[in-house]
């Protein structure tokens, strides 16, 4: 930890600056997308929002349970949050490549599901993967968030609010809650009139600079164990089961439960087979799962093993999801 004075504490390693600093910008963009969906997107109307909300909950709970079954009470139990995440950029990118084989209503469903999944991941990081809470710093963070929100309502310049956002990042970093939560908190203070322009400005640097840098910095792994030892490790079983099986199972099961209760219905022109295909694509954890790995485990060897498992599970989920969506249509049944 670099100490510039007796009271200013900041991360010092390049990897820390990527994971705590640059990724805060990614979470800022995620927060903007969540807020826009809540204000004017699919999540605005409660009846329409129920299906992706239930799907996201199922897609988080079932993978966590499956991981826990393989790592119950052991030294790797803290990794339960790893298979809960979905890489929104990858999953949406794949549906775009599939073109007309994925109906627009299904793409909208995936967007809403992935955004709720992002929100769930953010809450998990904030609550379960932070450090010891510094209540003074946390209180100062809340006060600064309120100040920024008031300034936004008064139409104070965005530049000044973003500068205050950097101060907010510092306070949250030292509060014991993960620093990236600052990005989401700041995003929720941005008024609707500024959301579209900010999202447009951030999409290219986030998707083509920040995420690739994060991926390159965090996917470099050293194989200190054999292939068979890696494949038969409880972490690999937990992550593979969670992402490849748990994601589609949880999403389909919770959607089915909702439709049986008559609380919602499938997106127009879609089938259960397509919903299962979307569930498989949601198993592409990649960047978000790797990010949670860096918080869940302190051992480099354990992190490397988990990263290999994430890459394998994400690749398998991609292949299964693409195949299912490519060879099916809305007339398909279970």
Model features per residue range: what roles?
Residues 124, 152, 157-167, 171-173, ...:
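Predominantly late transmembrane helices and immediately cytosolic-facing juxtamembrane segments
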Residues 28-44, 92-103, 146-156, 190-197, ...:
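C-terminal ends of transmembrane helices
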Residues 95, 99-191:
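Functional cores that coordinate and move charged inorganic groups
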Residues 37-65, 134-143, 147, 223-249, ...:
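Entry/N-cap segments of selected transmembrane alpha helices
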């Amino acid at each position: 930890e670099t100490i510039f004075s007796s009271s200013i504490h900041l991360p010092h390693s390049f990897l820390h600056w990527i994971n705590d600093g640059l990724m805060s910008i990614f979470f800022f963009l995620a927060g903007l997308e969540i807020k826009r969906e809540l204000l004017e997107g699919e999540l605005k109307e409660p009846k329409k929002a129920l299906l992706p909300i239930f799907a996201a909950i199922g897609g988080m709970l079932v993978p966590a349970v499956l991981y826990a079954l393989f790592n119950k009470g052991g030294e790797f139990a803290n990794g339960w949050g790893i298979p809960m995440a979905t890489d929104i950029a990858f999953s949406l990118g794949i549906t775009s490549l599939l073109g007309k084989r994925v109906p627009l209503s299904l793409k909208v469903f995936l967007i809403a599901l992935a955004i709720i999944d992002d929100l769930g991941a953010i809450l998990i990081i904030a609550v379960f993967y932070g450090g010891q809470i510094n209540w003074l710093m946390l209180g100062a963070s809340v006060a600064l968030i309120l100040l920024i929100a008031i300034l936004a309502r008064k139409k104070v310049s965005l530049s000044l609010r973003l500068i205050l956002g950097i101060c907010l990042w510092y306070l949250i970093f030292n509060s014991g809650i993960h620093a990236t939560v600052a990005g989401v908190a700041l995003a929720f203070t941005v008024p609707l009139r500024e959301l579209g322009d900010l999202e447009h400005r951030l999409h290219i640097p986030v998707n083509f600079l920040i995420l690739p840098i994060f991926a390159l910095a965090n996917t470099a792994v050293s194989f200190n164990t054999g292939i068979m030892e890696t494949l038969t490790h409880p972490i690999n079983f937990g992550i593979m089961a969670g992402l490849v099986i748990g994601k589609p199972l949880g999403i389909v099961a919770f959607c089915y439960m909702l439709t049986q209760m008559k609380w919602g219905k499938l997106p127009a022109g879609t089938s259960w087979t397509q919903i299962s295909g979307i569930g498989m694509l949601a198993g592409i954890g990649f960047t978000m799962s790797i990010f949670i790995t860096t918080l869940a485990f302190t051992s480099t060897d354990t992190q490397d093993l988990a990263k290999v498992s994430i890459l394998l599970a994400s690749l398998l989920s991609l292949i299964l999801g693409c195949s299912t969506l490519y060879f099916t249509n809305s007339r398909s049944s279970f």
